[in-house]
Amino acid sequence: MYNPYQQSGGPAYGADGYGQQGYGQAYGQQGFGQAYGQQGGGYEAGPAATYTAGAAQPLRPTATGFVNAAASRGLNTELKIPLFRLSFLTAADQAKFETLFRSAVRPGATTITGEDCKHILLRSGLSPFQLGLIWTLCDTNNAGELLFPEFALAMHLVNGVLQGERIPRALDSKVKNEVSSFVDLINFSVGSNSPPPEGQKARTPFDALTQGAGTLQPQATGFMPPTSFGVPQATGLGFGQAPMQPQATGYMPPTSFGAGLGAHTTGGNALASQMTGGLQQYAGGAFQNYQATGGKGLGAQVTGGFAQQPAGANPLLSQLTGGQGFQQQRQPTGANSLMPQVTGGFQQPSNAIGSQPPAMGMPQGLSQGQSVGLQAQATGFLPPSQFAPTAPLAAQKTGFGNNEIYSHAAFASGFPAGEDDKLTPEEKSLFYNIFDTYDTDKTGQLHFKVAAEIFRKSGLNRSELERIWNLCDTNNSGQLNRQEFAVGMHLIYRRINGHNLPHTLPPSLVPSSTRILNNVKNQLKVSSSSKKEPTRIDGLAYKNNDDDILPSFKNRRKTFTEPRQSKDNKTVDDLKKLVEEKRRKLESERSQLSLRQKDQQIKDEETMRHVDSLMHQIRSLPMKKHAAVPSDMKARFDSLTSSISTLFNNIAEIDDEITNAKVHLYRLKNPSSIVGSGPNGEVTEYDQKKARQKAVLAARMAALTGTPIETPSEADLRREEQGLNEEVAKIKEESRKNQEILNDIKSSITEISAPISTFIYGSGNADKDPAYERWELGIGLEPEVCDFIRKLKETQTQAQAQEQARAQEQARAQEQARAQEKARAQEKARAQEQARVQEQARAQEQARAQEQARAQEQARAQEQARAQEQAKADAASRESTRSPEEFARWPQDQSPSHPGLTASVSPQSQSVSVSNRGTPQLGQQQMGSGFYSDYQSADARAAYVRQQSQLKQPAPAPTSTTDFNSEDEEDEEERSLREQLAALKLKRKAEKEAKLAVGRNQTGASQDPAVRASPDEWDEQPSRPSHTPVYSTSPAMASQGELPKQGSSAPHLHPTTTGDRSPFFKQKQGSTSTFDLKAAEQQRRLQRGLDDGDGWSDDEDSSSKPTQPTATTSATDIPSSGADSGARAPVSAAPASIVRPDGSTATQPPVVPSPPVPQPGPSSGAPIPIAPPLPTLNGQQAGPAPSVAPTGHVERAASQPQINDGNEDDEDSDVLSIPESVESEDGKDQYTTAIPEIPYIPPPPPLP
């Protein structure tokens, strides 16, 4: 890089302090910045002088020198810079650098020269060494000139160094690629501009002022007040040219001298603009000495370097610029010199010198410590059309383009951190998702209420939120779209992270929609006629012009000194060369592109391998144990939570009930005269009104009638109402306090359960954690990473689900195993229990069988003993009651074959035995005795009555010698009930069979009446038992059918003979008639139903057979109305057996007995006539039924074999069953009961 500060002119630079003191301080702090922006600190800021000469106003100071010339030149709008965005620059910085570049690039060129760039870069205040390093980095093609991207890069590096950064030793690859791409794009677009005119050969902005003009044209800069001199000062002479027109440089106030400063020549040919802040290099490489420009006591002023003067010019004499008596030194200018110009200072009024007093508005002094001289006025040439002659000059900017970009403040703080701020894609994705969440209507606009509520959650104060809203709501619509909302959220996060909020929204944060809208607005504001040629080429509309001549890289160092050749002058060879050059360039670009692609592909493959390895490592990591709460604990927690709510609801209801109960209790304790009709008996307003009306009515009635009525007055009602209201308020206050206590308890329980709920169901604040949103939800990550996270979570979820399923399956299997084990244990216990019960049942059954056997054995023994005892008693009674005739016949009746029989054997027993010959004996004995009418004497009958009373007494229960266990005692009742049921069934079945047998016997007897049983056969032994059951004649029925004879003793039957007792012959009448008073009384009692026996018994043996009627053959056999009261049931005599021709016997059907006839008392009247015998069925007469004398003991007929004809059903039996309540008593007489003693009853009247 060409560096003029490293040449031999260093001493002048160092003494001057240009690079360190003069320029650096002028640029960075006071001199230069204050010279252009405000007045220097060394001058006295006095008010502008006012002049009274005419109506003209004083001229204001204007910018002078090179800056003025650059400002007048403007921007190079012909330069075509492609539309390309540099990522390392903000949009605002790139626009500023483009403006500066356009102002410095010469017309027709696309690059900025090193000399022009040096002047720009030196204003930064950096050292030449630093600037040299920056130039080396920016000049990528080593052309000595910079294109716009290279110039922008240089400005960016300068800005970084000013902000404290280091100069990089090499450019970043990304920055380098962007700059190279931008440079290539510019190179392809070169040649689109038209060539410059033929005669234009400008190289610098100053050439237009020095070339093409012989002499400088006069320029009016103001009015001169009338003075004694009145001649303006000549400001320049040309070589061989007419003097320059006088130039007015200011107004002169009237003085006592009345003459102004004379005109002096101040320069040679083409005097250039004076630099007031810097020096231009002289052609010889040396600088001019300082020119004395001050008055008395004033220091030298730096007025700038002057352009190179042509050789041969006459030297200009120096001009006095100070006060009176002070001679200014001549300023050497090399070969030629210029006369110093009057630029200010206090001028002494002197006619000899002709000095001109300065304007009062000019700075008039220097402060101590200032190294910069007085501020010079503009002395250069200004375009004559800039202002009117009567208007004052306006202050102009003195820098290139926008002068404020070069101020220290601009370089130091003109690039705030917010300029580089922009929204990242991750932030956009996150903020857009939040916007879509709240934009439920899908309108694309978020209302200010919703957006303000979202912003308020950040915790910023109101002023900051208002400032953020003003920044993001660019169009003041009160609503935010997606981009504006994202900008607002971005500013909120930056403020939370400690960054300051910008005063204006940076261009990088301006939403694209707002930028487009603003551009459209600006285009609409500008008319179509004033539109300029577009400064950028649209990439879509770009079309390469191959006919244009493009500069090569080798001639970029050169400038176009000659006009470009016309298209017509191009030859075919030149075009071929251009085509070949383009082809080579394309090939090189392709090769470089392929190399870059290969390198990028290798890097991508390596990156992918690394990513795959990381993914594999992540997948291979052991999964975190699922710390989920067991399902039973979770279910328990849920149940407790729900039960707590239920409990609180119940408590609230109970509290309400308690409150109502208290109110009701108060009303009961303090009864009111007002009857409430509201809910729960509450007193309503209507009830109160009604009570008041009632009280008023009662008071009026009392006043009318004069009688007091005891009714509560209105005051009493109000007092009661007030008391009730106070009590109700008190009760409600207590209820409210209780409710508050319950609410506190509920809140405490909620606080305790909240951590548990968070642990079970996860945290509810996880969405506020950016890391959670990033790595759990995948917000702000690349799509591949998001997919990987999603798949990883799915894998973890599946693994957890499988683990939970396995755990549940194991728990289910364990539960089933426990259930099976429990079932097996229960089954085993049940089997053991059943076995034990069966064993107990068998033991009980065996014990019961043994007990039954023992009981039967004991009962049999007792029965035998009782039968023997009864037999003995009967024998004894018969023996005592035997008549002398019987004693006389006793030896005759004795059978020689039975010598061992005692006197107790009676004919009655023989008759009974004879009657039972044909009945098979089953070993059953029927206890009982004869009837009362069987005894003739009173003593025998009294003995009979005593015997029957003794028999009626219950026998002592048999004592069991075996101790029963508790279980036998428990089953005793059940066993007895079962036995009773079985006995009833057997009884019904036996009765049914007996009825069937009776029916069959009656049928057989009616069919074969010829065969009858002869009474003579009773003494004989039966040949064989008959298949047809033969019912024996009951002694009771026999006694009922027999009437006592008058004039004879007790009837006596001889079983072996029938000669005297034939039923077919008339019986002999006794001479005397006996009447038994007791027998008649007994008969009468039986007829009247006064007997104690009811004919029912629980004995199965006695009640199993139906009572059969006794067949009678004579009228004398009148049956009794009932059986003996001591007997369980009257035993009917069996029908008379009829012997058939085939040897079988038929039973005669029973004959209905006639009603009993009372016997008259003993008298000597005629005997009672006996009716003839009743006719038998089918014209046959049954044989006479033998009369059996009553005996003391009558054996019960044996059970006959039952005929089973297949009908086992006993439900249709019409036989009355014994009630279950009637239980048989063990030990009682199962056969007969004794008749109690009967008091003496007078005999009935005799029969007619």
Swiss-Prot record:
**Keywords for this protein:** Actin-binding, Calcium, Cell membrane, Coiled coil, Cytoplasm, Cytoskeleton, Endocytosis, Endosome, Membrane, Metal-binding, Repeat
Q: What is this protein called?
A: Actin cytoskeleton-regulatory complex protein PAN1
* Locations listed in the record: Cell membrane; Endosome membrane; Cytoplasm, Cytoskeleton, Actin patch
> What gene is behind this protein?
PAN1
Family of the protein in this entry: Belongs to the PAN1 family.
| A GO MF term | Arp2/3 complex binding
- Residue ranges annotated as compositionally biased, kind Acidic residues, are 965-974, 1092-1101
Q: Where is the composition biased (Polar residues)?
A: 316-337, 916-928, 946-964, 1023-1037, 1105-1123
EH domain segment(s): 93-182, 427-516
Task: Write out the GO biological process terms.
Answer: actin cortical patch assembly; axial cellular bud site selection; bipolar cellular bud site selection; cell wall organization; endocytosis; endosomal transport; positive regulation of Arp2/3 complex-mediated actin nucleation; reticulophagy
Q: Which residues form a coiled coil?
A: 566-601, 713-746, 787-879, 965-997
